[in-house]
């Protein structure tokens, strides 16, 4: 059995880590570099760096900050936000990214997924999918959750894998920042059907929620921000808890 992963997420805006609720009401969560170093020392399995306003503002990811982080951490680093071409992905890799995450750009131009996979390998391509429960189904949203696409989540998840995505980062906008737990219904549906690793995101508020993301949602990795940024729990504490619960995890 492959070990499950704990992945802190740095949502970055204007050179600072921020955290909101349902993609709104952003509050400061500290220095990018200090948080990155902290998670490296805490033995996080990976780190995600998302420039959350890059796509909205139609600009590149803040690569100078990515480089600073990559020079200080020794765990895999995924970079997203404004990655809308092979060239921009290449720049991210040159600045220290191990993987790139695409979201809005993949919906606009799905062939970008294939181009990235062919150039850099599927293992380096993460497709982030931001979703909302709209009653009859879960719909995909883009531009940091501001634009509905009409796409069905399950159909889009299968499509991105067909195109070459090596991993899916699935974020429930309904749960984001609420600390009420992951949406394990759609998480399980995606995790058990797509054939690539799925990262649970949106809603982790305690260690039990992480456990449920693995045991009920069947996720391969759990991404969290609030509970770690504001030191409600540590990554080490989370891993010890999960191991006690019988989850295969790297300590």
Swiss-Prot record:
Q: Which GO molecular function annotation, any one, does this entry have?
A: imidazoleglycerol-phosphate synthase activity
Biological process, per Gene Ontology: L-histidine biosynthetic process
Q: Which Pfam families does the record cross-reference, listed alphabetically?
A: His_biosynth
Q: What class of enzyme is it?
A: lyase
UniProt keyword Nucleotide-binding present: no
The residues forming the signal peptide are none
The UniProt record lists the EC number as: 4.3.2.10
Alphabetized SUPFAM superfamilies for the sequence: Ribulose-phoshate binding barrel
* Major localization listed first in the record, in broad terms: cytoplasm
Give me the reactions it catalyses: 5-[(5-phospho-1-deoxy-D-ribulos-1-ylimino)methylamino]-1-(5-phospho-beta-D-ribosyl)imidazole-4-carboxamide + L-glutamine = D-erythro-1-(imidazol-4-yl)glycerol 3-phosphate + 5-amino-1-(5-phospho-beta-D-ribosyl)imidazole-4-carboxamide + L-glutamate + H(+)
Cross-referenced InterPro entries, in alphabetical order? Aldolase_TIM (IPR013785), His_biosynth (IPR006062), HisF (IPR004651), IGPS_HisA/HisF (IPR050064), RibuloseP-bd_barrel (IPR011060)
Q: Does the keyword Lyase apply?
A: yes
Q: Where in the cell is it found?
A: Cytoplasm
User: Would you say which domain of life the source belongs to?
Assistant: Bacteria
Which pathway does the UniProt entry assign to this protein? Amino-acid biosynthesis; L-histidine biosynthesis; L-histidine from 5-phospho-alpha-D-ribose 1-diphosphate: step 5/9
**Gene Ontology terms, cellular component aspect?**
cytoplasm
Q: Which UniProt keywords apply?
A: Amino-acid biosynthesis, Cytoplasm, Histidine biosynthesis, Lyase
Active-site residue list: 11, 130
Q: Which family does it belong to?
A: Belongs to the HisA/HisF family.
Q: Give the record's subunit note.
A: Heterodimer of HisH and HisF.
- State its role: IGPS catalyzes the conversion of PRFAR and glutamine to IGP, AICAR and glutamate. The HisF subunit catalyzes the cyclization activity that produces IGP and AICAR from PRFAR using the ammonia provided by the HisH subunit.
Q: Which named protein is this?
A: Imidazole glycerol phosphate synthase subunit HisF
- Organism of derivation: Chloroherpeton thalassium (strain ATCC 35110 / GB-78)
Gene encoding this polypeptide? Answer: hisF
């Amino acid at each position: 059995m492959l070990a499950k992963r704990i992945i802190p997420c740095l949502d970055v805006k204007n050179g600072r880590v921020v955290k909101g609720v349902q993609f709104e009401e952003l509050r400061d969560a500290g220095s990018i570099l200090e948080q990155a170093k902290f998670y490296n020392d805490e033995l996080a399995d990976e780190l995600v760096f998302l420039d959350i306003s890059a796509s909205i503002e139609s600009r590149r990811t803040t690569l100078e900050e990515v480089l600073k982080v990559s020079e200080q951490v020794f765990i895999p680093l995924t970079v997203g936000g404004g990655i809308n071409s092979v060239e921009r992905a290449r720049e991210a890799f040159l600045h220290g990214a191990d993987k790139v995450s695409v979201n809005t750009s993949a919906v606009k131009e799905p062939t970008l997924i294939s181009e990235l996979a062919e150039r850099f390998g599927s293992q380096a391509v993460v497709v982030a999918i931001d979703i909302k429960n709209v009653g009859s189904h879960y719909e995909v949203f883009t531009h940091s959750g501001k634009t509905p696409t009409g796409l069905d989540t399950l159909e889009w998840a299968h499509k991105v894998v067909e195109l070459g995505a090596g991993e899916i980062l699935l974020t429930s906008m309904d749960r984001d920042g609420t600390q009420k737990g992951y949406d394990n219904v759609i998480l399980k549906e995606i995790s058990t059907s797509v054939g690539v690793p799925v990262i649970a995101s949106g809603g982790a508020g305690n260690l039990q929620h992480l456990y449920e993301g693995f045991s009920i949602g069947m996720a391969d990795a759990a991404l969290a921000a609030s509970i770690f940024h504001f030191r409600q729990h540590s990554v080490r504490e989370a891993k010890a808890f999960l191991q006690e619960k019988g989850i295969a995890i790297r300590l």
